[in-house]
Amino acid sequence: MKKWIAAISAAVLAVTGMASAIPAATVTAADSKYNYGEALQKSMFFYEVQQSGKKPDWNEVSWRSDCMTNDYVTGGWFDAGDHLKFTLTNAYSAALLGWGLLNYGDGVEKAGQRTMYENNLQFALDYLVGCDQGDNIVYMIGDGSFDHVWWGSAEVYMDKYELMKGETERPYYTCEDSCIQADMAAALCTGYLNFKDSKPEKAKEYLEHAIDLFDRADKLRAIGDDAAEQPYYKITTFYDDLFYAANWLYMATGEQKYLDLCKTDYIPNLGKEEQSSEMKYTWGMCWDDVMQGGVLLYAINTGESQWKDQFTKHLEYWTTGYGGKQITYTPDGLPWLFQWGSLRHATTTAFLAYVAVDQLYQDDTAKAEKYTKFADNVMNYCFGDNSKNFSYVVGMGDDYPQAWHHRTSSGAWNDKWSNIGQTEGEDAKPHAHILYGALVGGPDQKDSYSDKIGDYQYTEVAIDYNAGYTAALCAMVEKYGGTSDPDFPPTETPKWDEFFMKASVNQSASSYTELKVFAMNHSAWPARTIKNLSYNYYFDISELVDAGYSINDVSVKIGYDQHSSDKGKISISDPIQYSGNIYYVKLSFADGSVVMPTGQSEHRSECQFRISIPDNIQGVWDPTNDYSYAGLEQGGEDAMVATDHITMYDGDTLIWGVEPDGTKPDPAVTTTTTTTTEQTTTTTTRATMTTTSNEIIYESAGALLLDDEPEKLTYRVGEDLDLTGLRISLKYYHGKDSCDVIYDKVSPADYPDKFTIDTSEFDSSKSGTYTIRVKASSDLILNYRLSFAEVSFKVTVEDHESTTETSPVTTTTTTASGQPTPSGAVLYGDTNLDGRVDITDAVLLNKSVAGAVVLEGDAKQNADCDGSNEIDSNDAVVLLRFLVHIINSLPSAE
């Protein structure tokens, strides 16, 4: 998402470029080594990737599917690498695409792209029609507080959204706004002009909406109440939009009144140069400033020389300078306006230059050549005419960006993205898909470029970034030719296993085998879930039969099901004969869509089950001949490996693994390769750290912490609850080296919109022990990815008179035998000796550090989480980092 949300002084930027000049040497586009037809074809592909709603039949992106079909207005383009929809950028982008097709449709057709181009343009325009509600507009769809803290694919977005928010429809926002409505009108006018002959009814609909939208925008003449989009797009002007749209209405209707409005009402209110009364000619056309596009259209529509001269100032500023002002040029010759979307600005100006050459400077050879060379240089810079021979268009050329900032194309299944596109580092991996045709933000003013997904100043992609670039390509294919690639897009083969099984042996004894299994969903071709999901575990009872027993002596039972309390609850079948003495049990999800590629806890489903015979049958149970047991190791999660001997099914269709008779999945259904995880031996490992590679993952996460319990913990019957002294903190850990303190030892009562104090259990009318809970709000849970969003403490109500307040109790934690002596079996982090490591251990350790609790024996040994042989605050920090998945093992000195 672009971070530019306020107007920047164009004059200041202009002055910084005074020492530069447009390069004297240029590459003639007619002799270019670049195929502009292919570039246009791939830009259409990018816009198809951005489609929301039901996927059209003509969409060629094989790894995209239906998504967000419950949006209040379906369809439209996702704005950038996220999944928000802004009417402003949809309209701005569609208008430029429509303008490019209108002026250079013959070239688009010769390049073999007219049908696809029209399909993409109509897709966006139909969305704008849907956003026109008559008395207002839908200006934004999506929840930014969720969207920008989750990284995953559009197809499973709503699965995660429903899980986190409990809603099946995204929020939408309405307003009346002169800027947005004028841009909508402009876009719809281009639709009318492009389709009036081929699709007259559709064109009529576009024009009717354009006229009405413009009339309402003109009557309002104000920026609307668009608060929801302001963190992303802060509109600063609207007269430029009215000016721009009025010119399009004139072109669509031929009615003079629109040009009259320009002259009398809009032009006097257009932008001026800094500290000057001169009409603005610096800066560039973009989503918040369409003035120069309006000036160009007005010059064309009126034929008045003063407006031709006015637009010439703009192109002079972008080339050799005008009035002492000139844009900055990079050492390689890129006109560089601004750090956000530098190529977006340059290519949009290139398009305006092409239009001006063809419609303003037909009789001025010098200017036509100058501005054509300028535009050619800009576009060819994008394709590799720079000192690095680097293409800034994904999928064009031999060397292009690898770490573009885009969620769906990444194919991330676990909400981890910081090293996507890298070859080294934790969780480094390529994008699942190549985002063909996307123009990235671009280099800085020294031609430097950081190809990292987190450096989105450089690597951002967006519909408005591609808009002027695409329109300029229309001009280039008409001027210089170009052909479509008949083999594009290429057929994609999954780069990793999409659905697969992992397993290890929990326990194995003389009468049973207990397995831990994970059903995995890493799908990205496209990302999806399977409702009717099941898997089979095969075992051989030959040793039982030889001893005179039968399958009737075998029992099966689930011991743990991650989804036991939700819609995915797993059931296990009685043993089913496969062949001879080989049987299997089928574990079936009530609803397999709970296994989804949306996060660390959802991309896998854990189940532990036991296959056993009666304990009194001795010496005949042997799992080593079991088909599915082969290759498994004992050790719980540490020993988990991917195994193709546990088969997975979508209904009756085999999608993973090899059955005992050699049956494999149909390659047409799924393409997979077996992967395994290298075993990592640690004293304590966290329960959610799994990968199918040999890498350790460090996750950003937060936690709510209880710093101080209230001063009063014991009450007499009838006394009111008093929470004086209650203090909590909220900390956010990212990477493995840093922590942000969001709230530090605050009273939750002071932040009622952020924390809820749940006292519903407390009953002062009768004696008892009651739990008081403090819970974080849903926005805190989302924004800081809280692994622990609740803390609690207990208070006691006594039925007799108490003469003194209860003092803090100092306690000693001992072993189960009551003796505070080490047993030698250390489970680091398990301070309360319950055999598990969880948040209750962290609470107890914090109390120990504060001096309220004394840990001895095993508890003290387990508390030494940093391995320093001392119990201090660092142990508490290390344990918390383990619990929120920043580190994956204890003890740790990190």
Which residue ranges define each predicted feature?
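Short beta-strand elements of extracellular/lumenal beta-sandwich folds
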Residues: 510-531, 537-539
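Cellulosome-associated attachment modules in secreted, modular CAZymes
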Residues: 19-25, 696, 796-894
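Serine/threonine-rich, repeat-prone extracellular segments and beta-strand-based repeat modules
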Residues: 736-782, 793
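Low-complexity, intrinsically disordered segments enriched in Ser/Thr together with acidic residues
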Residues: 585-619
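Aromatic (Trp/Tyr) and acidic
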Residues: 30-45, 49-100, 142-183, 187, ...
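Solvent-exposed, low-complexity, repeat-rich "mucin-like" stalks and linkers
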Residues: 700-739
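A surface/secretory-pathway sequence property marking extracellular, secreted
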Residues: 542-591
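Terminal connector regions
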Residues: 606-667
